[in-house]
Amino acid sequence: MPASTLLLPLQLFLAAGWMRAGIEKVIEPDWWSGTALEAFLSAQDGQMLPLFVPFVDYVVAPWTVGVAWFVMIAQLAVAVCLGLGRFLRPALWTGVLLNVTFVMSGRVDPSAFYLVMEMALLFALARPTSRRFAMRRATLWSLAAAPFVPFVTTLHPAEVIHDPAMMMITLCWIAAITTIVRSIDRERLGPLAVPLWQAPTDAAEPPPVPHGRGQTFDRGAQRY
């Protein structure tokens, strides 16, 4: 069974989740005025990752109305694209951008789980790569986790799920490991590692078949 079919429940779940979040904001007047976003930022004060605070202060806070509109439209657009199965890569990367923003602002749940599902779909859509290229990507994912290490506040099993820095590190590690494993599967399976929806559909033209003395039969033209 193609991976696209096996992962369809994740795609539909994400579509429903983003649609719910978008509609929730559309019917809330305070989101249109930016007041709800200002209240959200105030509530998250002290919980944001320190490296994210300058972005909020100098980019989000002065443009709360525009950012609020962007979030509403982006959430609805992601939901529609995932629900219809169109523009999946742009939709998933937009979802990743939104969820990473929410996690770095201190709101880990449910964004961390959305990120895992979005990454699973993106890896399913990606073409297999060589092990050397996969190692480079895995290294980049590992380096992306490094800036969050100083901001880990707890390793307690009951609290670590609420630590935005630890969640970002975990997601980067998951991406790095998955990248390497996919490259190993490609080398082990060869052509079978290519998803069915990415396999070439145009078969090679068969060579002419000899037909009689000094003549050939052209299969494409159906003539002698």
Question: In which residue ranges do the predicted regions lie?
Answer:
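Extended, low-polarity transmembrane helix blocks
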Residues: M1-L51, Y58-A74, L84-Y224
